[in-house]
């Protein structure tokens, strides 16, 4: 479970990414545009997830061999950093998906206001 303070920082990261998306690309004009953007972002999450699963597990397996052989030397970091890096990439891609969701929610809310 993620800590409360970390959850707050995650929310701040999503808000910041949302503001950056809006600043660079504006708001969505319709649901077709929103769908296309979120589909692309979700595909990037899937790619990052596959990379994480492959690279992270490979490095974790190598790390486990070192642990079993009681060979914990300076090279251990060479196996931990790729896990960190691929997890970081996956987290960044997920934040982008969350930001795009916020943009799409704004479009939905705007349409609801127009109906009222």
Predicted features along the sequence, with ranges:
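Flexible "arm" and connector segments at domain edges
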Residues: 1-116
């Amino acid at each position: 479970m993620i800590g409360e303070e970390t959850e707050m920082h995650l929310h701040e990261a999503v808000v910041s990414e949302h503001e950056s998306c809006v600043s660079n690309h504006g708001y969505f004009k319709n649901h077709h545009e929103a769908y296309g953007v979120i589909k692309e972002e979700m595909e990037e999450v899937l790619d990052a997830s596959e990379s994480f699963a492959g690279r992270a597990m490979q490095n974790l397996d190598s790390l486990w061999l070192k642990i079993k052989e009681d060979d914990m030397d300076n090279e251990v970091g060479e196996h931990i950093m790729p896990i960190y890096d691929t997890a970081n990439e996956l987290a960044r891609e997920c934040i982008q998906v969350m930001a795009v969701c916020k943009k799409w929610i704004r479009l939905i809310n705007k349409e609801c206001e127009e109906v009222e």
